[in-house]
A protein has these predicted regions:
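Active-site and adjacent substrate-binding regions of carbohydrate-active enzymes
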Residues: 1-552
Length: 552
């Protein structure tokens, strides 16, 4: 690109849970010291940024998203000095660090809430949270954690009032109508930027403000605060990412991506449509979703996850149509019996029944669509999960590094481990781990590394324009990414049967066409260009004469 791009434009983001990644001091809990020791692996893999789920002090009733201090590190994970050492090491490896910032709520054990519940009604201390005498206020706001909560309100005996909690009852919502709350959260952002972080993943960003008669999502007051947040971030004078988690349809996310608000947002609707395409073998809904996303917000501002630390969120018919939800529930048989809240509580590989073809074709799309691909730790290995653990813990088990005890995660005795390592058939850590897969040229890990290497060497896949191509086959999606003189053609078969394609490449008629990964020559582009894709097969092709990028 002739114009300097911010670091996050098209960057591959690797999400990890510090307490489940690597134990550096032998106490059974992953920590910043252990994570720092694995930074060379992340550099080797080819990711460009690390998203840390919350590392703040917390009673851990919701995996650290219930925070008691926004300006400290949980003692299990280290301290601010350990964070500084980790951040310095990450930057020395060329890796950016994105913090998870939970702006919507705190823990009930946060000092703010403890003062609020004892303070008199109408006092500044009480007003830091949202209180009511009526538990039926904001009745149109859906209960998000419907398997755990029956209401968005919880009675507090000390306060003599109900407090609002859009999440769990131990996570009271902050009151963003209070200027103190806004200034306090902006001060938290300043604190971490001053320590060198490169961005923030903004948790639950639509729910900051409330209004009677609405779903209490994405209200004008919320956008007004996000504009203030963007101004504060920009005032630091360097590229700092603001990435919003808004589980909403793409047309409702668009206002967050105005030039004076967030830099990017997750496209969870696209995630759902990718799984629906695999489940049904049809790409019609996926094509429509991609077209809508690019019409609403063009370019590479969408963050693209397949899985993360939560359930695969499908929603109540608001995020995606009910018929698409039913396609996923009926087609992904390994998700049956694992429904949690509004989604499926399984890791990627088990959800796909361990099928490597489905796994690879979904990631091939993820790495070639416009946006910021998000890779959840362990998915590069095809790690399994532990159904039966509480809440979302089945998806948050320790990273498998070696065939040694505990998968090389920790030397601690089994009872001290933060969670048990995977030992289920087909996913046992003694087989599915980094050390073993590094030695196997055809492993999923080495495949991911090769894909990320090719993506890094092909600017069209990171920055390029996106255009869907017409394709008569109902199970195949095809598109081109173009950046200057470079054009990359992508075709992916989401069906469980082979597909013969005839693509119209007449605009490149007679131009050389080569497959990216192995450099294989294909017939020159033509008006009726033929290619065969096996079941769940895909390919990337370079169109035209460019530098050879097939070797690494």
């Amino acid at each position: 690109m002739s114009q300097q791009q911010p670091w996050w434009n098209g960057a591959v983001i690797y999400q990890l849970i510090v307490r489940s990644y690597r134990d550096g001091n032998g106490d059974g809990i992953g920590d910043l010291q252990g994570l720092a020791s694995r930074l060379p692996y992340l550099r080797w893999l080819g990711v460009e940024a690390i998203w840390l789920t919350p590392i703040y002090p917390s009673p851990l009733d919701d995996g650290g998203y219930d925070i008691t201090d926004f300006k400290a590190i949980h003692p299990d994970l280290g301290d601010l000095a350990a964070f500084h050492r980790f951040l310095t090491a990450a930057h020395s490896q060329g890796l950016k660090v994105v913090m998870d910032l939970v702006m919507n709520h705190t823990s009930t054990l946060h000092p703010w809430f403890q003062r609020a519940r004892w303070a008199p009604q109408g006092s500044p201390e009480r007003d830091i949270y949202v209180w009511s005498d009526d538990p039926h206020r904001y009745a149109d706001a859906p209960v998000l954690f419907r398997h755990f909560e029956s209401s968005n309100w919880e009675w507090d005996e000390v306060a003599g009032q109900y407090f609002l909690h859009r999440f769990l009852r131990h996570q009271p919502d902050l009151n963003y109508a209070n200027p103190f709350v806004q200034e306090a959260m902006l001060d938290v952002v300043d604190f971490w930027i001053d320590r060198g972080v490169d961005g923030f993943r903004l948790d639950a960003v639509p729910f900051l403000c409330e209004e009677e008669g609405s779903r209490c999502e994405g209200l004008p007051e919320t956008h007004a605060f996000l504009k203030r947040l963007r101004q504060r971030v920009d005032s630091h004078g360097r590229d700092i990412l603001l990435l919003g988690e808004a589980i909403q349809p793409v047309d409702e996310i668009a206002p967050y991506l105005l030039q004076d608000e967030l830099h990017g947002a997750y496209n969870f609707a696209l995630t759902a449509h990718l799984f629906a395409a695999i489940a049904s073998g049809s790409v019609d809904n996926l094509r429509n979703c991609l077209e809508e996303a690019q019409q609403v917000v063009s370019g590479c501002r969408w963050a693209l996850p397949l899985r993360n630390h939560d359930e695969l969120w499908l929603g109540d018919g608001h995020l995606i149509p009910e018929e698409v939800i039913q396609i996923i529930r009926a087609g992904l048989h390994q998700g049956q019996g694992h429904w949690l809240n509004w989604g499926i509580n399984r890791r990627l590989a088990p959800l796909l029944n361990g099928d490597p073809g489905s796994n690879r074709v979904l990631h091939a799309l993820l790495y070639s669509l416009p946006g910021m691909p998000c890779l959840y730790y362990g998915d590069e290995l095809g790690m399994g999960d532990w159904p039966g653990l509480r809440d979302r813990d089945p998806n948050r088990t320790p990273m498998a590094w070696t065939p040694a005890r505990n998968g090389g995660f920790s030397t601690a005795p089994d009872p001290l481990l933060v969670l048990p390592p995977i030992t289920s058939p087909g996913y046992d850590y003694r087989v599915v781990n980094v050390e073993v897969q590094k030695q196997l040229p055809g492993s999923l890990l080495n495949w991911h590394r090769r894909m990320l290497t090719c993506r890094r060497l092909l600017p069209a896949l990171r920055y390029g324009d996106f255009e869907l191509l017409k394709c008569a086959h109902p199970g195949v999606i095809s598109y081109v990414r173009c950046d200057g003189s470079m054009t990359v053609l992508v075709a992916a078969n989401l069906s469980a049967a082979g597909a013969s394609l005839h693509l119209d490449l007449s605009r490149w008629s007679g131009v050389r066409t080569r497959e990216v990964f192995w450099g294989c020559e294909y017939p020159p582009a033509s008006e009726d260009w033929f290619v065969y894709l096996p079941a769940h097969g895909f390919s990337w092709w370079l169109i035209g004469e460019v530098e050879d990028v097939s070797s690494d």
